[in-house]
Amino acid sequence: METQRNYPSLWRWGTLILGMLLICSAAQNLWVTVYYGVPVWKEAKTTLFCASDAKAYETEKHNVWATHACVPTDPNPQEMVMENVTESFNMWENNMVEQMHTDIISLWDQSLKPCVKLTPLCVTLNCTNVRNNTSNSTSSMEAGGELTNCSFNVTTVLRDKQQKVHALFYRLDVVPIDNNSTQYRLINCNTSVITQACPKVSFEPIPIHYCAPAGFAILKCNNKTFNGTGLCTNVSTVQCTHGIRPVVSTQLLLNGSLAEEQIIIRTKNISDNTKNIIVQLKTPVNITCTRPNNNTRTSIHLGPGRAFYATGDIIGDIRQAHCNISRTDWNKTLHQVVTQLGIHLNNRTISFKPNSGGDMEVRTHSFNCRGEFFYCNTSGLFNSSWEMHTNYTSNDTKGNENITLPCRIKQIVNMWQRVGRAMYAPPIQGNIMCVSNITGLILTIDEGNASAENYTFRPGGGDMRDNWRSELYKYKVVKIEPLGIAPTKTRRRVVEREKRAVGMGASFLGFLGAAGSTMGAASITLTVQARQLLSGIVQQQSNLLRAIQARQHMLQLTVWGIKQLQARVLAVERYLRDQQLLGIWGCSGKLICTTNVPWNSSWSNKSQSEIWDNMTWMEWDKQISNYTEEIYRLLEVSQTQQEKNEQDLLALDKWASLWTWFDISHWLWYIKIFIMIVGGLIGLRIIFAVLSIVNRVRQGYSPLSFQTLVPNPRGPDRPEGTEEGGGEQDRDRSVRLVNGFLPVVWDDLRSLSLFSYRLLRDLLLIVVRTVELLGRRGREALKYLWNLLQYWGQELKNSAIDLLNTTAIAVAEGTDGIIVIVQRAWRAILHIPRRIRQGFERSLL
């Protein structure tokens, strides 16, 4: 009985404990939460566009780099340093280099398209040496000077007429025909189509800033001793690179950027003779190049609208072009280069020798000076041997203050080492001089034994990618991934309609500054981080339209214009993709969006504190990147189900407020309902009248009018008031029907209302009695089940007790028997000596 009294309390406490366990287990559930504007990026290849301050340069000439089509440079460039971020860079696998190389070639070709083709000049040239006024020249051209005077026939304005003209050509631009000493042709006539550069085209390098479109960013390594490959610990993000001058040169890098602390050696493999070595200097070396000849330029008409520009005459003596470099500065720089090379080569002997041969562009230091293409012999620069920790020794015994490099000039240039394309550079009038800074070297190492004590380096080049690589080594392009997914304890509870705001994008400069912070710290600043993507797209479009408007007379878009259009389309596509995903997930206009998708521990089983307090968004993204598509799919399925539920819920939205019933827009509907009710009542009145008439006709009455009296019941206590007054009183009396339309309607409404009331009351009473009966029966059934459960519980308990008692008794009886047997055996063992003694005693007796 005591146990029976404790059953209700046990059930009560058990239910309470079970509920608490369910609540606690539900509280530990994690749900997927979407974050927009997180500092996450991935390496990408994208179309970059250019920015340039073209107004600061001469505007009369058309620059070959077409920087007028670039957007203006930002007067306040932003650079956001990312704390606690380590990023991997690889200058040898940088798509920015390939893109710049392709752009420069395309710009070069595009600038030559409208220029004059020099096919009519592929004729026989009768050439003689040009003599100085003060000295005699040799009789043969091979031994003569750099210039030769050639006469040839060209077609005039009239195609059937020819005239003989003459012009000065450089020796490098003509070759003899059949080893004839007087008859020559232009060097490229048998291999290339020669195009003359337009007279007003300038080759002056203008700094070009490469910029990333909206949705992308450029990461910059700020380590002062960074060698171009590996991890960088000082990383910042920029929108555009620094101004890069597209200087086309070989062997020596001109007017580039300098190293900050020490000379930097950059190479893919320093012992591989097929790989170029890029040396970035710390201190620039001045180089001054001069063409001392005072040339005049003449124009030769090749036909209608076509003119060929050539050197007409030279005023004064013919002197060779040359470049001057300070010997002291060069030797000091070379000593620093040797020191850094010795670190990579274990302090062995290092020698510098001239280039071993090849194309003239590679064999010499080639560059453009004021429109003339110079090819300078650098044997005077690279002819020395260096011992580690010893003084400098050189084969050059000259003690001149400057090193003079003899230079030759070519007008027919085969740019980019491509077959089939050549350019004729028109001569420049007057003296030419250009002052540049040597900021880097391109070297190659001779093939040899790795155990050799002497390493030989030679100047190299020819692949312009190395020129661009020397400036772009510290940059890489990344794609911003502003959508982040992480587990939280918050779940989307309510289903309600959202007022969807206009979504804002992520600022790749602002929010990447929080890249090194933990996820919890970075998520606090999402509002600041997600504001400038769309505005960046609009600003880029504005800049592009401004540039096109300024050059609207040019119907042909430049390479830069096309790239800007591509960049903008790409940015818009990325923005729309992110907004589409947010819309599909029901997160439009939200920076932090909770969802109804439970977090699966197989994606990540880390705790909340491990995720939000110890991990960055980049680390977290790498961990769950394999499950991103699956999570996206679940978010879409969840939102689809929620929208379906929302649609069902909104079907009842019209009942949300009773005041909407009085909206004037509903009045026509109310009038329609009133007319339908009145029409129905009239129809019912007619039907009832017809049925009443038919019923009375069947009973023998003949209705004369609608005023026929109908029986009206009255009480038995009311006697007949007049006339006959005797006999048995009738139970009914007749009353007249009402007169008029409104009384008829009112009477019918009253009768219909009373009938409906009585019918509904009867139905309600039936329902109440049924529910009461069901409730009583249900309560009795539950009570019976409870009693039955108690009875069987008690029976089970009694059976268990009986079983336990029986088991205990059986065990006790068995144990007692075993104990008795053990005792008897033990006593028998104890009595053995006594029995033996008694046996001996009996035997003795």
From Swiss-Prot:
Motif (Di-leucine internalization motif): 844-845
Keywords from the UniProt entry: AIDS, Apoptosis, Clathrin-mediated endocytosis of virus by host, Cleavage on pair of basic residues, Coiled coil, Disulfide bond, Fusion of virus membrane with host endosomal membrane, Fusion of virus membrane with host membrane, Glycoprotein, Host cell membrane, Host endosome, Host membrane, Host-virus interaction, Lipoprotein, Membrane, Palmitate, Signal, Transmembrane, Transmembrane helix, Viral attachment to host cell, Viral envelope protein, Viral immunoevasion, Viral penetration into host cytoplasm, Virion, Virus endocytosis by host, Virus entry into host cell
Transmembrane segments: 674-694
Site (Cleavage): R500, A501
InterPro entries for this protein: Gp120_core_sf (IPR036377), Gp160 (IPR037527), GP41-like (IPR000328), HIV1_Gp120 (IPR000777)
Family per record: Belongs to the HIV-1 env protein family.
Protein name, as recorded: Envelope glycoprotein gp160
Species whose genome carries this gene: Human immunodeficiency virus type 1 group M subtype H (isolate 90CF056)
